[in-house]
UniProtKB/Swiss-Prot annotation:
Family annotation (NCBIfam families): L12
SUPFAM superfamilies: ClpS-like (SSF54736), Ribosomal protein L7/12, oligomerisation (N-terminal) domain (SSF48300)
Ranges in coiled-coil conformation: none
One GO cellular component, as annotated: cytosolic large ribosomal subunit
Gene Ontology terms: biological process: translation
Subunit and partners: Homodimer. Part of the ribosomal stalk of the 50S ribosomal subunit. Forms a multimeric L10(L12)X complex, where L10 forms an elongated spine to which 2 to 4 L12 dimers bind in a sequential fashion. Binds GTP-bound translation factors.
Functional note: Forms part of the ribosomal stalk which helps the ribosome interact with GTP-bound translation factors. Is thus essential for accurate translation.
TM ranges: none
Keywords: Ribonucleoprotein, Ribosomal protein
Name this polypeptide is given: Large ribosomal subunit protein bL12
UniProt record similarity statement: Belongs to the bacterial ribosomal protein bL12 family.
InterPro entries the record matches: Ribosomal_bL12, Ribosomal_bL12_C, Ribosomal_bL12_C/ClpS-like, Ribosomal_bL12_oligo, Ribosomal_bL12_oligo_N_sf
Length: 121
């Protein structure tokens, strides 16, 4: 008569904790395995990707309507006319750094409507 899996499970369930520890040790020696190694691998840390919270808005090119882009840059950055013109003409250039996603997307939209080519990083 062979022992079934259910009978083995019932026998282990009836054992004390110390008896189960001794059984595990005996099985590790008999079969040359380690229960701790399998547990350590299964319980490894799970890495989570952090969501980026700060973005940089880069003016890649002014486009055909440079005057409208300069006005949009002045409105977004608070720069004077000459500074905004120099910034637009020196494209690619960083307009704003470390802004929120919503602010970066709003600035990108405004500049693209003026005819600029913009990138958010």
């Amino acid at each position: 008569m062979s022992i079934t899996k259910d009978q083995i499970i019932e026998a282990v369930a009836a054992m004390s904790v110390m008896d189960v520890v001794e059984l595990i040790s005996a099985m590790e020696e008999k079969f040359g395995v380690s229960a701790a190694a399998a547990v350590a691998v299964a319980a490894g840390p799970v890495e989570t990707a952090e969501e980026k919270t700060e973005f940089d808005v880069i003016l890649k090119a002014a486009g055909a309507n440079k005057v409208a882009v300069i006005k949009a840059v002045r409105g977004a950055t608070g720069l004077g006319l000459k500074e905004a013109k120099d910034l637009v003409e020196s494209a690619p250039a960083a307009l704003k750094e470390g802004v929120s996603k919503d602010d970066a997307e709003a600035l990108k939209k405004a500049l693209e409507e003026a005819g600029a080519e913009v990138e958010v990083k």
